[in-house]
């Protein structure tokens, strides 16, 4: 517009021109006048047209004194893109320009005059000074609010809105026309015609804002003066609403940027200031709420205007670029450094970028150090988080810190920091403090000090089959394999090798730790610290306490892989809370494959106390393996095995690697003492190392204790062979078949490994702590457990880890697995066997026991367990006897095998090719040590089914001769002495209610130490030849026949089949017949023929009543008595056998029974003799009690060497053998009878 004429009337005119009125769009002639003495104050006037103005024909249509305006802004709406709005106390006046240039020229002129007017007005009584120069004001958004004369400070933006009666508008009575006035830090609602703001909200209190069409809303949080809620307002149109939204967001972002740097105290330069970089709420300085909101919002939008404060400071650079968004890597946060809307982003981008990059990446690389705030000094600082907030400084460092997201949480950040916890981004556990501590670096929590390689992040427990179980560091820290690497986190190791560890162990531990410990929680803190249970630490602690779940054990020999013995002890008992933890021990023991006999190392108490009622803690001789006590009442679930069920390592885990969980069955991890676990044969003593956790360390205790090396499961070079059998069958029936994965047992790979049967896992007598005399291992080998409830037999031959851990599994894997060769007598095979791998591999596993998995628990889960106390006694005796013979595994015959079908060919060792007889035949070779080979089955089968042929007649070397049908009453228990390798079947079958086919010895060679007891029918026909040398006459019962002779005899027996062996058929029945007389609880009890002390079994519940006892010599008694005649009933229950052996009276059994009783003595010889009796009495015990007695009565006398009742059997040797002879039938109801 042309300059106003230079006439007196126009001397004060600054600008004139045609502009439009926004609503009507009519053009009007506007005149901007400056203040003058003649004309008055500065004002904006408009006329209908220029002619009227020039001729002064009329007064202006309207005149607006600029000093009355509290704000002048540029605006735009749906109709007009170029508006200039003037807000006065009572109205809003706008003019529309045709172009942006025109708009800007008018805007600048108005601002200049407005500023002067305000200055004059301030001088007079002053309003807001014109501190803000027009230029400065323009700089920001072109709208400097510095000119305001209005009711408050200058406003960056002012919108006239109508507050709606909704949300806070209603509750706070803020309804009607208001001016929404925006400053760099606040939003104010000023009511029309009012000079005072009704409400002033901090931008930082705004949670969010938005618009919908011509409505705009703001949501504020609790910190707002109004309290939480929303303000809804209506504006002219959606364009205005959108403009409000964008402008407020910008202000929030700007404030956020500005505020952050301030809050950070520009420590960009000083790393020392670790300002927590929390996502700031930005409350600190009440940064403009906008910032807060901005924080939430992407900061992509560049700020239009620099916040005046920053501008005023004139240090645009000072503003901190750091944006939380920076952390996000968005450079977008635009604080305008120079005030130009764009520039901020630019500057900031650079600073941020360089800083951010380091931040982003370094955290990834950073060592775990949780940098202290100070540490984070340089943006590039390695500290991942550089948490220390310091980074704020103007550049990126802050962002780095702030941006925990990238890194794991920044430690330095205050908890409030948003990033603080987010640290986990990298995968540190989500909430874990420790992860946040992990310093940003995802992996490093406390690694920093050790700063282990990422490889270490392995605080996770390894669930993989191969991982070793967790180790406990001597310091008590648990070594956990985390991250599935199977690596253990060894806090102590991390911190430094625990002194307790031997050098190599320590090295191994360190190595282990290094390799695996990716995420140790220690933030470079000492292990102690790591383990402190701080909130963050708690997770760590829990980790420590966490047990490794990996089924497979670490390769014991595997360098670091080997357990550190020191860990075993770790003070951190909880670590071992898990039975599996115990498993660790053998690894520890065998660090690097070298066995660490040191019980101290290996046997640190696990801190686990067995709670199971029936279980007696395993003797200390378990060497700390017994620290773990199973809590299950009768059956132990064998987490150990489960956890490290097999220390499979290269070798296959014993099929027993799984522990039967069936409530009724206790797992029958008869692993011979975890021989597998023993790192080497030499470690054999620790052979049960595996079992350690289970069974109160049953496996473990023998492992170490066993004098003779049992065949360590570890097949190779001190590597633990997986000793399995810790798996407990949970199936209601207790069917061990579940364990069928004979693969475990039979793992072709290493038959060598004796599976550590669940036996070790067993908490209680299952394990039969080794008897004093007996090598723990050997004893185990000798024992077969019968669990009436579990329906599993426990073959604990240590040597034969494969003892059926789960009833069938162990059996199948182990006993049946006995290969025919096992028929061959191997005296002391057990002892010799130690080197043989426990693994029950197909035939390969000499140790294999019955292959057939079938075992039914007799229905009482508890029945399965025999009193542990007895068992312990038994173990003690066994140990004593073990000197005589490698004790058979002390498996209490807690499992009852029930076969319904006839014609089952005996329980064959699953993989084992031999199985002389179809019935289970433990190869005679299943010597105490080589139990696997020893044929005696120690298992008594009770067949419900008709025509079950007990193939028990496997005679060890000699065919028992197919036993003709035993006398109807006779339940023949032919159990080759354990010592007699040949004795094949230590399996006694009891058929109830079905005519039993005479047991035919399937394999001529192996006498089946299998006694058939049929309750309902005459198993009667089954008789095992008694004669040791001669083929046993069919009628001759296999009473547990262990040679009466001392060990030599036992050995003989072992060599010869129990029944068919040189010992003669009599040798077969190491097992006493069970008298099922109605007066006695007929319910199926586990009857365990205990071949002499070798395997003392106390039948926790014996069939025979005391009355029977008279006839019967308890094996234990015989064993204990060493020579004491077995005739006395008293003896029957005495602990000597460490279990009650109930021998049927000869009267009950008939002549045979007598022989059977003598068999007891023989049992020593026959230690292999039937250790297990399976009674299918559960169903019809009551019904057929008569039969049982008859059977028992009819049972042929045991061969001379037969343990039953024979005075010989009483001999100490016999006692050792007695262990094998264990007769116990547990029924559910009564404690004794378990009826």
Curated annotation (Swiss-Prot):
Motif (YXXM motif 1): 460-463
Motif (YXXM motif 5): 658-661
Motif annotated as YXXM motif 7, chain positions: 939-942
Annotated motif YXXM motif 3, positions: 608-611
Phylogenetic placement of the source organism: Eukaryota, Metazoa, Chordata, Craniata, Vertebrata
Localization per record: Cytoplasm; Nucleus
Keyword Amino-acid biosynthesis included in the entry's annotation: no
Modification after translation, per record: Serine phosphorylation of IRS1 is a mechanism for insulin resistance. Ser-307 phosphorylation inhibits insulin action through disruption of IRS1 interaction with the insulin receptor, and Ser-789 phosphorylation is increased in the liver of insulin-resistant rats. Phosphorylation of Tyr-895 is required for GRB2-binding. Phosphorylated by ALK. Phosphorylated at Ser-265, Ser-302, Ser-632 and Ser-1100 by RPS6KB1; phosphorylation induces accelerated degradation of IRS1. Phosphorylated on tyrosine residues in response to insulin. Ubiquitinated by the Cul7-RING(FBXW8) complex in a mTOR-dependent manner, leading to its degradation: the Cul7-RING(FBXW8) complex recognizes and binds IRS1 previously phosphorylated by S6 kinase (RPS6KB1 or RPS6KB2). Ubiquitinated by TRAF4 through 'Lys-29' linkage; this ubiquitination regulates the interaction of IRS1 with IGFR and IRS1 tyrosine phosphorylation upon IGF1 stimulation.
The IRS-type PTB domain, residue ranges: 155-259
Protein name, as recorded: Insulin receptor substrate 1
Compositionally biased tracts (Low complexity): 265-276, 378-399, 407-419, 669-689, 785-794, 801-810, 872-881, 1025-1046
PANTHER family recorded: INSULIN RECEPTOR SUBSTRATE, INSULIN RECEPTOR SUBSTRATE 1
Encoding gene per record: Irs1
